[in-house]
Amino acid sequence: DHLLPQQTRGRDEHQPAMPWRQLPLFVATSVYTDEPYNVTRALLLMVILTATRSGEARGMRWAEIDFHKRVWTIPAERMKARLQHRVPLSRQAIYILENIRGLHDELVFPSPRKQQILSDMVLTSFLRKKKAVSDIPGRVATAHGFRSTFR
């Protein structure tokens, strides 16, 4: 019933996660858009499609993406565990990236005004605004919570 195995080590505080059965409707009604480019929505879709931490996705650089092999290689210095991580990119993830390719030189999802890494509050604000349902009553889902949606 889960895509990824449960973690075996002790956990820190649980982040509110969206129940996986509700994810397709949420994406279809609140995230997916026909807009040519909306940095927040594109970033959230990438977080969901890759099950990566939002900080890893916010810091994604074009040089890390191999379109031919459909792999995103996150350097060790940007990973929590300090080990290089290779993320396979689905057809949908490649589609998002191809639609925004060439818009920015280095960062894939830069802040529109400053061309630097987006604040971690961008996704939090979006999810609050959309009242993203979570597995914790009275709390909205968090970007980090999407990682546990796949466990």
Give the predicted meaning of each segment.
Residues 1-14, 94-128, 132-138:
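Major-groove DNA-contacting interfaces characterized by cationic-aromatic clusters
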Residues 1-60, 68, 79-83, 102-103, ...:
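Basic, Lys/Arg- and aromatic-enriched nucleic-acid-binding interface segment
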Residues 28-41, 50, 87, 99-107, ...:
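Short, basic (Lys/Arg/His-rich) helix/loop patches that form interaction surfaces
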Residues 64-66, 89-92, 147:
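Active/binding-pocket-proximal capping segment
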